[in-house]
């Protein structure tokens, strides 16, 4: 195992552990699909590629018919270490989200109809939207936690069009939406007119800039889906916290294992707990399921993959975090001067 770890370290600066190798070997036994291996192993895609490449170079795996398979040497390795195939027992009813959306079936159909001509994801803004079922499940989750009804809700970045589902629910007292992409803000304005929802404010805005006064300390709840760098957590989640009125308010956002190692998770959680002074109340595994975006062949993931095959299912998922403010919690109000680093780091793959 040490030989494999050392070979992986030659290929990436992402931290690698014996558990990393075990996770990838376990996933390979469950599926030869490279996207599914990333999904099941729950390691950052660039790290999975480094591990698979090292295993290939050392003779533990082979590539056949666009699949990753264990060689005889690889089978002997997993038997030696007692590594079996990764099992998946996700609830087939709620898809592991812990909320069911049957009560929102009419809202779901309305949402699908209104968003059928939505703007396609823009690669330059690291956009990728979730499935309609995920968006509606967000409404169900937020409502179940007491964070929607008669609340003022801020949406920071909305390629998922969560604001549209919120309008259809009729639950919030007021909604505000910020997004850097004018295509999205115009689409949301059009949807608001179609729905007849008036208590919404929509702005085209770059979150690297400090929020204007009209957005600070005015809201009960925020939701955002940030790029997965520590700077992006400050820009999106930190800005979200800055919109909240005070203690007892809530924020929602997604973080993946596909582009964030547990080492990065630790740094993100340090920012949340130590810099922002909030508490994490919920982390729901693979809550957010993303529709495969049309620019996959333009991404770093495609350049890295040893097997060039498009994903056949929605492989990209993120954990849903819920945070709550306490006495002394504070957001991030300074200007962020980074450029592309807002979207990219060593663990990124969808940019």
Curated annotation (Swiss-Prot):
One of its GO terms (cellular component) is cytoplasm. This is N(4)-bis(aminopropyl)spermidine synthase. Keywords: Cytoplasm, Polyamine biosynthesis, Transferase. SUPFAM superfamilies: S-adenosyl-L-methionine-dependent methyltransferases (SSF53335). The keyword S-adenosyl-L-methionine does not apply. It catalyses: 2 S-adenosyl 3-(methylsulfanyl)propylamine + spermidine = N(4)-bis(aminopropyl)spermidine + 2 S-methyl-5'-thioadenosine + 2 H(+). Its EC number is 2.5.1.128. Belongs to the branched-chain polyamine synthase family. HAMAP family: Aminopropyltransf_BpsA.
């Amino acid at each position: 195992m040490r030989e494999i770890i050392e070979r992986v370290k030659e290929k990436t600066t992402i931290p690698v552990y014996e558990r990393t190798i075990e996770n990838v070997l376990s996933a390979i036994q469950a599926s030869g699909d490279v996207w599914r291996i990333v999904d099941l192993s729950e390691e950052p895609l660039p790290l999975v590629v480094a591990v698979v490449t090292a295993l290939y170079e050392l003779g533990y795996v082979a590539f056949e018919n666009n699949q990753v398979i264990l060689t005889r040497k690889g089978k002997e390795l997993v038997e030696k270490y007692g590594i079996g195939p990764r099992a998946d027992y996700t609830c087939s009813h709620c898809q592991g989200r812990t909320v069911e959306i049957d009560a929102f079936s009419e809202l779901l159909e309305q949402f699908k109809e209104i968003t059928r001509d939505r703007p396609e994801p823009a690669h330059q803004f690291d956009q990728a939207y979730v499935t309609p079922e995920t968006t509606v499940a967000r409404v169900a989750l937020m409502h179940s936690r007491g964070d929607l009804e008669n609340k003022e809700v801020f949406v920071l970045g909305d390629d998922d069009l969560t604001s549209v589902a919120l309008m259809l629910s009729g639950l919030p007292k007021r909604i505000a939406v910020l997004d850097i992409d004018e295509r999205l803000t115009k689409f949301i304005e059009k949807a608001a007119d179609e729905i007849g929802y008036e208590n919404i404010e929509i702005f085209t805005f770059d979150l690297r800039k400090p929020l204007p006064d009209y957005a600070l300390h005015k809201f009960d709840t925020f939701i955002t889906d940030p790029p997965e760098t520590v700077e992006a957590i400050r820009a999106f989640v930190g800005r979200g916290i800055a919109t909240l009125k005070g203690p007892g308010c809530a924020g929602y956002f997604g973080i993946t294992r596909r582009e964030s190692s547990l080492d990065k998770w630790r740094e993100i959680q340090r920012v949340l707990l130590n810099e922002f002074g909030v508490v994490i109340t919920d982390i729901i595994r693979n809550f957010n399921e993303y529709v495969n975006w049309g620019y996959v062949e333009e991404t770093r993931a495609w350049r890295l993959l040893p097997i060039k095959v498009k994903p056949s299912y929605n492989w990209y998922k993120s954990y849903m975090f819920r945070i709550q403010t306490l006495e002394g919690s504070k957001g991030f109000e300074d200007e962020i001067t980074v450029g592309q680093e807002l979207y990219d780091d060593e663990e990124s793959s969808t940019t």
